[in-house]
Each structure stands twice: as structure tokens, then as C-alpha cells.
Amino acid sequence: MITSAIDIIVPVWNRPIETRACLVNLVEHSPGARLILVNNGSDRETENLLEEFAEALDERALLISSRFNLGFVRAVNCGLARVEAEFAAVVRQSTLVSEGWLEPLLMLTRTRPEAGVIVPRLERAPLKKEHRGGSPPISTTEVSHGDFAAMVVRKGVYDLIGGFDEEMDGAGWCLKDFSRRALRGGFLTFAAEGSPVAAVDEPLLGSAERREELLLRSAAAYRARWGEERAFCVYFPREADPDAIRQRLDLMLRGARQGHTFVVLVFPATFKVLAREGYGTLHRNIRLEKLPRLFGAGQASKIAVALGAGTPGLVTVAGVDGISAGIPGSRPFAELERLIVAAEAEKYGKVP
């Protein structure tokens, strides 16, 4: 029996033309992988297509069939339960991968053993010709959650926490919940972006009313487990000690892993140092913003108002306790620290 480096799960429900294109690309650009094809109650034409691929690939394919549609998330979990490789990828039937798409993801698993969920570079548009091949530069950063369009999951994560929550929405809330459970188990979620993967929005199934009901129920279940995700604007004055800023960015990284988002306002000299040291790409939920060189005290409020207009509920935080951010209602950093540390203890089992 051949042992593959990775098993790729593709849940399929009808749409044989898209499915064939997806599978042809996967076979061409995923050498050594085994395909786990989950026939999710498809019509006869699609069923024949899957049987054709499974027969042609022999030991490089496993076909799982259901006579009715299990739902996407349950189909993914059926595939995960049959994974034998060290890593599993989940790919939607409408996704098109390109040459070299897997290498950055698997490379990251070797250099970062705590990487539990990894997404490739996803593009919500057809791939351009210049993207089909070559070796683009690879960028790596932590992200809030995976993506069902394409992602890699370490089998050790599945063995530890189980599959995706089948009662959730099969989208953002379900993916966030999985990454939070992975975090509780000691695993992180990354994007390792090299060769692009074309992701197409899936057709919406069911009535708008039922979809909205499921979305609200999923959001409520997520918040009950993990708490509210909040947005913060953290201001550091010109005289702030760079080492203190680094320590506080490390704390914000822990908060970003819990789903919080941060806009960090720093002066140009500090911004340059932090960007050079990689603090600008710690996590997609942390954004460094460079303040104007000639920054007056009154401008802080204007910046906060502008940021708050696009982010309801934004909380302004003074990066250095005792030094006002110049914005009415700003909270001390110690309060933010207590929030993050308390969640780690209560939700993630970490001792302060």
C-alpha cells in the first residue's frame, strides 16, 4: 500500500464540469497526494465522474459515497475520519490550484510544529496566465481561521480536537471555532502564501431566512464558547520605549489569536524599526499604522473617529499607562491585558 504525504479531501455535490476541472488540477499539481472524494449524494453524471477518477488513480484515491446530501461540513468530517497521512487538505470542488501550491504549506509544517491549520494564497478570481507556474515569493503570517476553499490541517489537530462543528454555518463561525479549539490544544493558524489558488464563491443553498437563522445561531454558539471578538485602537506616544512596545505587541498577538483585532498607532521612527523586525506581519488581525511626522495632540481624536466609523465598537487604548492617548474614553493598557489573560485562563486552559 502506498503512503501519501497528504490526503486531499474534496466533498462533491453535482456540478460535474467544475468538479472535473478541480480534480484534474489537483492531480496535476499535487504529486504524491491521495484524493479522498466524498460523493455527497450527487446525480448520476457526477457519480460516474468520481468513479472514473477513483478507478484511474487506484491507490491514490479513496471514494466515499452517500446516497443523500450530508451537508458540506459533515462531508468534510467524513473525509477527515479516513485520513491516513500526516496532513489533510480540504478543497472545495470549485477551487483551482496552481503549480507549487502545496509546497509552502508543507514547508511551514516542518519549520513550525505548532502550525495546525494553514491556508494558501487565495484569489477570488480566475488565475492569470503568469500565475500558472513559477516560484513566487512566500509570505507567512498568522491568521484568525482557515478557509474551506483550500487549507491544510495537521492530522494531529484532528486527532486531538475532532472535526468541524456540524451544527454551525459551514463558513466563518465554524472555521473560527475550529481554530480556537486548535489554539486550546496548542496549535496555531497560518497563511503561507506562495502560488495562488483560485477560490470561487459557492452558490447559496436554502432560503435566505434559513441561512440567516443558521448564521445567527452559529454566532451565538461561538460567542458562548469563546466570548465576544472586539476591536482595539492602541496608541503609543513618541517617547514610548521600543522594548515596551514589543512586549505589548506580543500580548496583542495572544489577543489576535482569540479573534480580537488591533490597529496600533506608532510614530514613523518606531514604525520603521518594528516593520524591519517583522512586527507588521505578526497576524492579520494586527495592523501597524504610521502616524504623521508632525502629529498634534488633537489629531488622535480625529484618527480614532475615522477608524471607529468603519469599525463599530472600536475601543481606544493608551499604549503606555499614565500617558493619555488624547482621546476621550481611552482605556488603560492594563485593562486590555487583563481581558486577554483572563480569556486564556478561562477559555484556553492557560495558567497566567
Task: Give names to the regions the model predicted.
Residues L96-H131:
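Conserved donor NDP-sugar-binding/catalytic core segment of glycosyltransferases
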Residues V24-A33, R254-G259:
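Short, acidic, metal-binding catalytic loop of nucleotide-sugar glycosyltransferases
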Residues N39-L49, F267-K272:
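A conserved acidic beta->alpha catalytic loop
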Residues G134-G156, S207:
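A recurrent flexible, glycine/aromatic-enriched loop bordering the glycosyltransferase active site
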Residues P104, A150-G162, E167-P196:
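A short, conserved alpha-helix in the catalytic core of glycosyltransferases
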